[in-house]
C-alpha cells in the first residue's frame, strides 16, 4: 500500500471513530432520567384508602371525583398508611385562595405523629413546600418582618429534629434549599411536583425542571404527609414508585 492509500485509510477510520467517541461521551454525560410522567412499571396511584388521619377534623380532607380537597383547618397533616424509603413521587396541587400554604412532608417517623394534637405540625420530616406567591406579602404585612427567609417556588428544608444538608442556593440562615428557578404558578392554577428520594437525598422538579434539594437526610425512612395549614388547597394525580 502506498503512502496515499495509507493516508486515505487513516482518515476514513478517523471519521468512523470520532462520531462513536462523541456518542459514547454523550451517553456518559447524560443525567439519569427523571420519570416525571409517572408512567411505566412500578408506579401506582395513592387514593383515599392509602391514607390515614392524624390530627384533622372529619371534614379537613375530602375526596371527590379524583380530587383531594383540604380545608386548611385545623393545621395538621394526613399520612400515608405505609412508610417509604427510596421512591419517586408525583403530585399536582393548586391553592384556592391567595397566600395559601401547604406542602408534603417526607420521611416522617411514627414518633412525630403519635398523639399529635390539632393545630400542631410534626417535628420531624423533610418539607417540600407549596406556597402561593401572595404568601410573602401577607407574611410581611402581618408580622412586620422581612420575608427573605423563604420563597414561594419550592423550598426544601428539614423540620424540627430531622437533618438535611440543603443544596444551594441557600436561605440566609442556610437551613433551606432555595429553588434555582421560579416556576410555580399562582393560586387557581395547577402545579406539578416530581420528587425523587434516594438514600437520604431529595430532589424536586417543579413543572418539569429540577429546582431544589438536599442530601444526608436523617431519618430517611417514614411516612409521606400532606399538610393542612390554614387555607384551602386541592391535590390530584398523587402517584409513587418505590425504588431499591
Predicted regions and their residues:
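Bacterial N-terminal signal peptides that target proteins for export
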Residues: 2-13
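Serine residues within intrinsically disordered or low-complexity segments
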Residues: 5, 22-25
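Bacterial N-terminal signal peptides
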Residues: 12-22
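Carbohydrate-interacting regions of secretory-pathway proteins
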Residues: 26-244
Amino acid at each position: 500500500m502506498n503512502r496515499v492509500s495509507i493516508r486515505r485509510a487513516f482518515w476514513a477510520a478517523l471519521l468512523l471513530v470520532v462520531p462513536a467517541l462523541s456518542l459514547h461521551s454523550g451517553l456518559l454525560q447524560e443525567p439519569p432520567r427523571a420519570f416525571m410522567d409517572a408512567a411505566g412499571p412500578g408506579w401506582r396511584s395513592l387514593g383515599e384508602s392509602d391514607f390515614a388521619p392524624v390530627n384533622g377534623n372529619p371534614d379537613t380532607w375530602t375526596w371527590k371525583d379524583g380530587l383531594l380537597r383540604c380545608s386548611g383547618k385545623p393545621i395538621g397533616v394526613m399520612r400515608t398508611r405505609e412508610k417509604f424509603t427510596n421512591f419517586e413521587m408525583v403530585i399536582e396541587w393548586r391553592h384556592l385562595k391567595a397566600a395559601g400554604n401547604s406542602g408534603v412532608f417526607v420521611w416522617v417517623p411514627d414518633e412525630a405523629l403519635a398523639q399529635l394534637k390539632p393545630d400542631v405540625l410534626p417535628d420531624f420530616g423533610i418539607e417540600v413546600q407549596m406556597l402561593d406567591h401572595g404568601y410573602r406579602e401577607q407574611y410581611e404585612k402581618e408580622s412586620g418582618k422581612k420575608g427573605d427567609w423563604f420563597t414561594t417556588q419550592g423550598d426544601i428544608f428539614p423540620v424540627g429534629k430531622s437533618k438535611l444538608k440543603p443544596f444551594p442556593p441557600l436561605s440566609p440562615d442556610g437551613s433551606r434549599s432555595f429553588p434555582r428557578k421560579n416556576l410555580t404558578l399562582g393560586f387557581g392554577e395547577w402545579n406539578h411536583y416530581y420528587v425523587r428520594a434516594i438514600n437520604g437525598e431529595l430532589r424536586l422538579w417543579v413543572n418539569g425542571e429540577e429546582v431544589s434539594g438536599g442530601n444526608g437526610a436523617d431519618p430517611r425512612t417514614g411516612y409521606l404527609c400532606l399538610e393542612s395549614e390554614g387555607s384551602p388547597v386541592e391535590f390530584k394525580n398523587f402517584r409513587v414508585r418505590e425504588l431499591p
